[in-house]
């Protein structure tokens, strides 16, 4: 993996990500920073991060259509809004609100403790929905569930076609 972009960013902020198709891993950074690394076939892909106060915009564009991989490291406590064109996403347990949209692919989100959430809204138009921490599993067409708890964070995940898995770790 080759580092393509890196910026300091304090924990507790919010990051909005626009990701072209590919295989992505989102995980906690070793400190208060955003770091983007590319691997596999990087082609002419680019990474851009802009920050204003406690908000950051991150874009990965012009990704090739075969074997593109990227790792995005963010502070352990961060609110995330993520838009993925298509591909595979694996998100480690990041503390904060999460909003994830993907048209197609496989999305796996480590939610940590389900008691940290006040509301969960997850849907898959065509495919499998596994949400073990929230005691829910469905497959087929138009899978959707909502869940309410006593925590302070929200999780919204919407996938067009593929598999959506919400897991503890």
Question: At which residue positions do the language-model features occur?
Answer:
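Gram-negative (and chloroplast) outer-membrane scaffold detector with strong preference
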Residues: 69-70
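Membrane-spanning beta-strands of outer-membrane beta-barrel proteins
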Residues: 9-10, 75, 115, 150
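Extracellular beta-strand/beta-solenoid scaffold signature
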Residues: 2, 66, 140-142
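Short, surface-exposed interaction patches in beta-rich subdomains
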Residues: 49, 55-57, 61, 92-94, ...
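A mature extracytoplasmic/lumenal domain signature
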Residues: 19-21, 28-32, 38-42, 62-64, ...
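Active-site alpha-helical segments that house and flank conserved acidic catalytic motifs
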Residues: 15-17, 82, 122
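Short linear S-[DN]-x-LW-Φ motif typified by the pepsin-like aspartic protease active-site region
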Residues: 1-51, 109-111, 118, 156-169
């Amino acid at each position: 993996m080759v580092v393509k972009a890196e910026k300091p960013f304090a924990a507790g902020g919010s990051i909005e990500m626009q990701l072209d198709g590919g295989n992505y891993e989102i995980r906690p950074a070793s400190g208060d920073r955003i770091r983007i690394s590319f691997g596999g076939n990087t082609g002419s892909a680019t990474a851009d991060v802009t920050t204003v106060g406690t908000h950051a915009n991150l874009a990965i564009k012009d990704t090739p259509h075969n074997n593109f991989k990227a790792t995005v490291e963010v502070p352990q406590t961060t609110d995330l809004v993520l838009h993925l064109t298509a591909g595979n996403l694996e998100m480690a347990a990041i503390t904060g609100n999460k909003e994830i949209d993907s048209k197609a692919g496989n999305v796996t989100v480590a939610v940590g403790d389900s008691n940290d959430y006040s509301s969960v809204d997850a849907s898959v138009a065509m495919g499998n929905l596994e949400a073990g921490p929230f005691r829910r599993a469905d497959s087929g067409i138009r899978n959707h569930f909502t869940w309410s708890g006593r925590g302070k964070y929200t999780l919204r995940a919407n996938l067009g076609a593929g598999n959506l898995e919400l897991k503890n770790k």
